[in-house]
């Protein structure tokens, strides 16, 4: 009897081993949420159970939402237990009114099995694949074309060609290589001289020399900057109904120079998003912030400044993420992102960073950086040197290139205060800037007004105005609000026929005495019709504040000559963040 039992005892371990091998070989491989499950969810589930909608209180957008009880109190996903997971029951339900996806094609058996196996394996969630850093230690594949490879990237390309049953093309002729190189790097075809020089150069490094030559050319920056400017929504106009001209070309030049100087992408990013926050920011760094002044501005009459200021801030948030993160963000303004792991509240956390800038959708597009062309700087510096010899010392933030601010501060220290009428801080429903130059205001209608914020009126005795008018008007000077206390008034006469201000002789100067005022007040210029009513009462160019015993009068003719020189040089303006 013992002889018969021994073979049976020997077979038991063998059978156990066979069972284990069979069980292991048939056990499903480790399922990846990103690779296997997320595509199913995005294609067939997320439209009803995600960022926009969360039907039944169930969302597959974030792990904690997917694994918490739904409105029914049931768990859609029970890690390690697909049989008790409500999602599997609903995917397999025979009743079409309860089966998911509702009113759509059911998932295939293979898809349901994948989800079921994933749950049984623990329903492990994974960070979105787009936000997982790539493995820097990937070994380039071996390839039969190893003799053709010149760098590690070539090995990946050749391996893919092998996989697809393709062979690499023959090496291009020198003429074709040069043409490709020129078009790739500069967008311009090579000249006849370029061809002749390249073909005559028998140096093994001739191609590399051509690359270096093109990388150092201004055309390289111009070509590649154009692509970035598209991302920056660059335009020479403001958009919306009037689409008026915008002076922001210095930002375009900054981008070109950044490419040509091979600025690091890190610095390129910092200066555009936060150049104004850098310690002792230079002119160049301030101009870089114009990246986010490319938002549209609405100059249509009757628009609300705050509405379009907020619209610009929202657009800046969306653009920042689209450009630097390669993901849409505008949708998160209303709900969590449908596909990317970005929560609704995170949009407004980012918005808070941008929601502290000074621009307010004004006609004059303040704040602006005012600079001078390189060829004009010596003239301005000469005037400033003179003013500094006669003016009292004033603290001036006059770093790299801030000549305009320095000159303005020096003139103010001499009590010479002349401002552009276009620098108003708020606008009525009718007043606009002259379309072609944006330097003076027009379409001034009866009962319209402009406001200058916190003007120091101490010792100011009168205001002068440079204007042109078809029918004349009455100009009232008021404090604090449009119909606040009136401190002065002046009548403007007729100066022109046709569009006022087109010719120098159409301009006039008028002076209006004002009552004594102490300190800083909001100053309102209120316009009334005279004898006739017309849509456009006048065109206003500048305002001058006359102070008691101004210091500049003591400087006589020489100061006047220097001042004329200063006014002959037109500054350049660029919208910036501040």
Predicted regions and their residues:
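Local sequence-structure signature of Cys/Sec-based thiol-disulfide redox active-site neighborhoods
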Residues: 30-47, 54-60, 320-328, 340
């Amino acid at each position: 009897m013992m002889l018969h039992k021994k073979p049976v005892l020997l077979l038991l371990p063998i059978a156990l081993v066979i069972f284990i091998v069979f069980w292991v070989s048939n056990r499903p491989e480790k399922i990846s949420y990103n690779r296997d499950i997320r595509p199913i969810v995005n294609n067939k589930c997320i439209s009803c159970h995600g960022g926009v909608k969360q039907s039944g209180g169930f969302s597959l957008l974030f792990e904690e939402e997917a694994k918490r009880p739904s409105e029914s109190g049931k768990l859609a996903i029970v890690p390690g237990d697909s049989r008790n997971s409500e999602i599997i029951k609903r995917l397999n339900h025979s009743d079409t009114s309860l089966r998911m996806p509702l009113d759509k094609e059911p998932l295939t058996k293979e898809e349901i099995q994948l989800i079921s196996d994933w749950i049984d394996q623990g329903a492990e969630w994974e960070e979105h694949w787009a936000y997982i850093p790539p493995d820097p230690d990937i070994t380039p594949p071996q390839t039969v074309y190893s003799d053709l490879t010149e760098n590690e990237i070539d090995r990946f390309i050749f391996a893919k060609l092998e996989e697809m049953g393709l062979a690499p093309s023959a090496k291009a002729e020198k003429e074709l290589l040069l043409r490709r190189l020129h078009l790739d790097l500069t967008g311009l075809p090579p000249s006849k001289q370029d061809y002749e020089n390249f073909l005559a150069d028998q140096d093994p490094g001739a191609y590399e020399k051509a690359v270096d030559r093109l990388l150092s050319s201004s055309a390289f920056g111009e070509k590649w900057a154009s692509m970035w400017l598209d991302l920056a929504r660059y335009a020479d106009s403001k958009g919306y109904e009037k689409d008026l001209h915008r002076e922001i070309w210095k930002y375009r030049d900054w981008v070109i120079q950044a490419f040509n100087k091979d600025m690091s992408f890190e610095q390129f990013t910092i200066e555009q998003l936060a150049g104004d926050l850098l310690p002792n920011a230079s002119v160049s760094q301030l101009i870089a912030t114009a990246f986010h002044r490319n938002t549209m501005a609405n100059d249509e009459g009757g628009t609300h400044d705050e509405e379009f200021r907020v619209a610009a801030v929202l657009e800046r948030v969306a653009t920042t993420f689209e450009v630097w993160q390669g993901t849409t963000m505008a949708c998160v303004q209303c709900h969590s992102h449908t596909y990317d792991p970005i929560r609704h509240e995170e949009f407004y956390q980012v918005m808070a960073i941008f929601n502290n800038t000074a621009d307010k959708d004004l006609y004059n597009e303040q704040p602006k950086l005012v600079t001078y062309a390189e060829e004009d700087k010596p003239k301005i510096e000469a005037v400033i040197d003179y003013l500094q010899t006669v003016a009292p010392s004033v603290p001036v933030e006059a770093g790299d290139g801030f000549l305009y601010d320095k000159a303005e501060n020096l003139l103010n220290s001499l009590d010479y205060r002349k401002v552009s009428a276009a620098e108003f801080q708020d606008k009525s429903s009718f007043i606009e800037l002259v379309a072609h130059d944006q330097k003076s205001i027009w379409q001034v209608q009866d009962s319209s007004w402009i406001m200058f914020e916190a003007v120091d009126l101490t010792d100011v005795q009168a205001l002068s105005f440079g204007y042109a008018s078809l029918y004349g008007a009455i100009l009232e000077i008021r404090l604090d609000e449009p119909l606040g206390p009136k401190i002065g008034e002046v009548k403007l006469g007729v100066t022109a026929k046709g569009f006022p201000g087109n010719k120098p002789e159409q301009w006039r100067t008028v002076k209006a005495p004002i009552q004594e005022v102490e300190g800083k007040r909001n100053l309102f210029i209120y316009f009334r019709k005279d004898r006739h009513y017309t849509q456009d009462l006048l065109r206003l160019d500048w305002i001058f504040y006359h102070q008691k015993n101004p210091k500049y009068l003591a400087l006589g003719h020489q100061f006047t000559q220097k001042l004329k020189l200063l006014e002959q040089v037109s500054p350049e303006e660029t919208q910036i963040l501040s």
